[in-house]
Every structure is written in structure tokens, then in C-alpha cells.
Amino acid sequence: MRSFLTGEWINDTIAYRRPIAVMYNNIQAGLPQSGISKADVIFEGQCEGGVTRLMGVFQNYDDVTSIGSIRSCRDYYPFLAAEYDAAYFHFGQSDFALEFLGDPELRTFNGMNGDYNYERRSDRVSPHNVFTTPENLVTAMVNKKVSTYLDEDYVAPLKFNKSAEPIEYPDADKCITLKTGYAYNDAYFVYNEEDGLYYRYEYGQPQIDEMTGEQIAVKNIIFKLVPGEQYWNGSPLYLLTGSGIGLYVSNGTAQWIKWSKEVDGVNTNLGCNYTYGYGPTRYTYWDDSELIVNQGKTWICIYEQENQPNIQILDK
């Protein structure tokens, strides 16, 4: 059957595995990451000081031998993991995230509390040296009595093109280089016409997976633009519910899209009305018809709508 995460054909047993979502370090002292190129979906968003954290969502992790380095949770990441009904693994958390980590709907696992086994590698300094394996994470799910399989009525968050041939958008903008606007790590993607993938760069060099030795590459890139609010201490406050605009990049083109996400609850303990939702974000074209995504891996950027002009779509 087809993967719920990539739209590609995979083994039936793997297709109904509950995904594992891992909070990846993305500061230079923690690079290179290990295993992240095998993630089916990667989320990126800012935390304090403009530094970005990545969250890799894995379903087919049979050939993943190392995952890391793992860092602490920020409040909006468990809700991004919940969009894929994933179990979410982190190592520590911000004070604001602590408000949500006991929610059983979010299936969170904190290595700092001993929720899963890990190792501290000697080739990096703390806190940039926490690594683990998929086997450790699955064992943690079993020990916590979290099902390792999705429900039979599970519905994929994204709607994929049924054909392996990419959809052509003649009216879309040509996009060979996509500059994300994340200034701290100067992150951008470059399109390779030969294989139809976007290759990731940051900190002035290709972003390499230590485990494979390969540069990270994806078929699709989605931007979800959200209000750039802040908590009282200046930490980013990103509310993922409501509606807004976004960007879809694939197969050498880019087009502006729309998104919406339902509210399931409101938390008033964080100095604001923090709206949250467990369900997936719905992406649509400008005419409100559902976005059809090309088969393959997807990188999703959570980005402040006020900084939209910093996203650069370049034709070379």
C-alpha cells in the first residue's frame, strides 16, 4: 500500500506503524545530525535567538542505526507530531512546553526523565551529544503502553499525487533556489533537475547526514506562515490553529497556497489564550481545492508571516 507520509508504495506492515517524531538539534555544535535523511517528513521552526530546531518524522526506520543529536521540546512541536499521530521524543523542554507534556493525546517521551534509553557520545560536548536508536524508541512506546500501530481508519495529513510523475504547474513561479529566510543558519534549498529533488544547505555548506554521508534532499517543501508572537520572555509563540497563507515548492516551481487548522482547546495558563489542535493542517490551492502533493519526502517550515518578504524564490 501507499505510505501515509510520502505517498509512495511501501510494505503494508510499515504503512500502519505509528510514526516516531524526534526533536533534532540544529545548532552548529550539534552537527552533523544522524539519521535525519531517512525521515519521511521534516519540520523546521525557530526557538530562542532565531536558532531553528528540526523534527524528523519516521515511519520506515528499519535501516536507521542512529538518531541524534536530540534536544529539548518547544511547545508547538508536540502538536506538529500529533498531526501524524506520531509518538514524540525529546530531551528536556522549555517551561512553556511543560504545560502540554502530560497530555495523553500527544504521546510525549522525555529522555531526560528516563522515558527511553540513549547514549551520550564523547565526540561532542553536552547538551549536543544525546543519541539513540529506533529500537530504543519503540521499546519506550511498548513500556508506556502506547500502541506502535496507527488506527485502521487513519487518514493521511497530506493528499498525494497518485502518479509517480510530478504534477506540472505552468502558472507557478520557477524555483531553482529557495532561500528560507531563517537568518541564523542561512538555510536554503537548491533544485536538482536530474532527480527532481531539493537539496538542503545551511551554515554555508551542504547539510549532511552523518549516518549516510549524504546530503539531505526532499521532493516537497511547504511553508506555513503563522503570526510571529512572543511570550513574556521573548520566546517565540506560534499558534498553529486558524488559517493563513503558505507556500508549496516542488519539481522546480513555487506557488502560494492557503492553510487551515481546527481548534480543539484553549490553554489560559501561559499568559495568553493559547489555542491548539491535534488534527492535521489542511492545505489548499488559492481556489480552496485541496493541495495535491507530489510523492516523496516533505520539509515543512513554520515561519513568521511578518517575515514573508525574507523568503526568496529564485529562478537560478
Where are these regions (language model features)?
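A surface/extracellular/periplasmic glyco- and lipid-processing/surface-interacting theme
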Residues: 1-41, 48-316
